């Protein structure tokens, strides 16, 4: 067994104060996302998405956030993937944005709902053609014999769709995560981190400080 207990560091990049928080958590999220992009973080839109199966077994994976607004957070995926199948069983979902270099993280609890075909189509046609073709290739989360099988299927589909537009697969779509709570975490000195949680209450958000 490896002992990692001596790996530690101080958090020194600043605090988070109640008086500085906007009433709407999405406004703070937009500020933090902008700062993450300006800091040239690797994949600032990458989020850990957690879902659960029919037995309550959770599973997590990294997915890219594609849009956010006051209604929530949007991502796209293969509808035959493990995440989509689990969402169909249980729409409760958790998102985590781990912005380690900024000593920040944002944790979201909410419910996922399918996007309309219009919203899916709008995003799909904006993707590079190779990415559109790749959506046809992978039966996500299924077992395959070798990578060559994927590459062969990609080349086959690339030839098939060489001319004209790539149609949207029926098994490809997206989800809107409507947040019920959003927690903002900022690292602090001596492990006295700042944590604030926004909880949806009717049409407003309640803001509470949490112990680190």
From Swiss-Prot:
A Pfam family the protein falls into: PNP_phzG_C
UniProt subunit comment: Homodimer.
Family: Belongs to the pyridoxamine 5'-phosphate oxidase family.
Presence of keyword Repeat: no
Keyword rRNA-binding: no
Provenance organism: Shewanella denitrificans (strain OS217 / ATCC BAA-1090 / DSM 15013)
Cofactor: FMN
Protein's recorded name: Pyridoxine/pyridoxamine 5'-phosphate oxidase
Gene3D superfamilies: Electron Transport, Fmn-binding Protein, Chain A
Pathway in which the depicted protein is active: Cofactor metabolism; pyridoxal 5'-phosphate salvage; pyridoxal 5'-phosphate from pyridoxamine 5'-phosphate: step 1/1; Cofactor metabolism; pyridoxal 5'-phosphate salvage; pyridoxal 5'-phosphate from pyridoxine 5'-phosphate: step 1/1
GO molecular function terms noted in the UniProt entry: FMN binding; pyridoxamine phosphate oxidase activity
Gene name for this UniProt entry: pdxH
Residues annotated to bind substrate: 8-11, 66, 123, 127, 131, 191-193
């Amino acid at each position: 067994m490896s002992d990692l207990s001596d790996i530690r560091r101080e958090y020194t990049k600043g605090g988070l104060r109640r008086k500085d928080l906007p009433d709407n958590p999405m406004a703070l999220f937009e500020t933090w996302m902008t700062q993450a992009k300006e800091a040239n973080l690797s994949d600032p839109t990458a989020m850990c998405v957690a879902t659960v199966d029919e037995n309550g077994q959770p599973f997590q994976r990294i997915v890219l956030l594609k849009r956010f607004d006051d209604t929530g957070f949007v991502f796209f995926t293969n509808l035959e993937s493990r995440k989509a199948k689990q969402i169909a069983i249980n729409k409760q979902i958790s998102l985590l944005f781990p912005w380690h270099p900024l000593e920040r993280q944002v944790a979201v609890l909410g419910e996922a709902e399918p996007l309309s075909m219009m919203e899916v189509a709008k995003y799909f046609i904006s993707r590079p053609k190779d990415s559109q073709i790749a959506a046809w290739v992978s039966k996500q989360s299924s077992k395959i014999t070798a990578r060559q099988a994927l590459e062969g299927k990609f080349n086959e589909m690339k030839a098939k769709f060489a001319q004209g537009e790539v149609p949207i697969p029926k098994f490809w779509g997206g989800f809107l995560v409507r947040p019920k709570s959003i927690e903002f975490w900022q690292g602090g000195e001596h492990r006295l981190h700042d944590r604030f949680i926004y909880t949806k209450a009717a049409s407003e958000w309640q803001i509470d400080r949490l112990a680190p």
